[in-house]
């Protein structure tokens, strides 16, 4: 599947939610809403004219289309879209600066023969669609990558809460609890009875949105506990 950027920017885009807040839903984003979310995604991931994006995830979901692919197209950044293959990925990504990987993809890559000798310096990997474990973050940072575990939803925006790791020092600072949500925020947030509520211009709904995620804060950092 490819994306028709010109058509999308005229008509908007419908993506499928992951189903974490109930049955998977079709979420429509207008051209205006897309541009707003692009601005957050570009700034938060440091995607600029010198970047190159490799997309290996489904374009029907926000992670595949809204997180990096369309924002990069919006500013004329080269984008290559391929089907994920863990055995080919490390060769494919050598010429790119940004990619998005769910944790299952990240783990599959570490099990290939090429993993032990790979050098991921200059690559920024945003992880999401599921919880990203500390061992995966550490593994990719040890290979030279910048790793950004990211929390977002089709309903509230693809790039909302995340952390950025490029060294063991910051990992050790945050690794006091099991599942990181982040300390960088592109939405307003509050915790009510343990549940995360978010609001902001990326959201397709007005007012506060109940995410269904149970979280807690520790010194300005949000951590994930489970689902409501």
Protein language model features and the residues they cover:
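Conserved pre-ATP/AMP-binding loop-to-beta segment of ANL
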Residues: 2-16, 46-52
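Short beta-strand-to-turn element immediately C-terminal to the catalytic PLP-Schiff-base lysine
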Residues: 28-30, 159-164, 192
């Amino acid at each position: 599947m490819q994306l028709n950027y010109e058509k999308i920017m005229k008509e908007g885009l419908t993506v499928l939610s992951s189903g974490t807040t109930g049955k998977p839903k079709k979420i429509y984003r207008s051209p205006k809403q897309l541009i707003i979310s692009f601005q957050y995604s570009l700034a938060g991931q440091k995607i600029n004219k010198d970047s190159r994006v490799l997309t290996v995830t489904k374009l029907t979901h926000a992670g595949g289309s809204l997180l990096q692919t369309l924002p990069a197209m919006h500013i004329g950044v080269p984008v290559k879209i391929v089907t994920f293959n863990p055995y080919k990925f490390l060769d494919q990504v050598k010429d790119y600066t940004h990619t998005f990987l769910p944790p299952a993809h990240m783990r599959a890559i570490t099990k290939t023969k090429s993993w032990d000798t790979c050098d991921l310096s200059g690559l920024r990997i945003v992880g999401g669609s599921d919880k990203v474990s500390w061992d995966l973050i550490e593994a990719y940072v040890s290979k030279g990558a910048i790793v950004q575990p990211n929390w977002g939803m089709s309903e509230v925006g693809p790039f909302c809460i995340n952390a950025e790791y490029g060294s063991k020092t910051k990992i050790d600072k945050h690794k006091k609890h099991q599942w990181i949500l982040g300390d960088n925020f592109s939405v307003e947030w509050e915790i009510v009875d343990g549940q995360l509520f978010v609001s902001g211009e990326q959201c397709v709904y007005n007012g506060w949105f109940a995410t269904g995620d149970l979280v807690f804060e520790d010194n300005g950092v949000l951590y994930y506990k489970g689902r409501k």
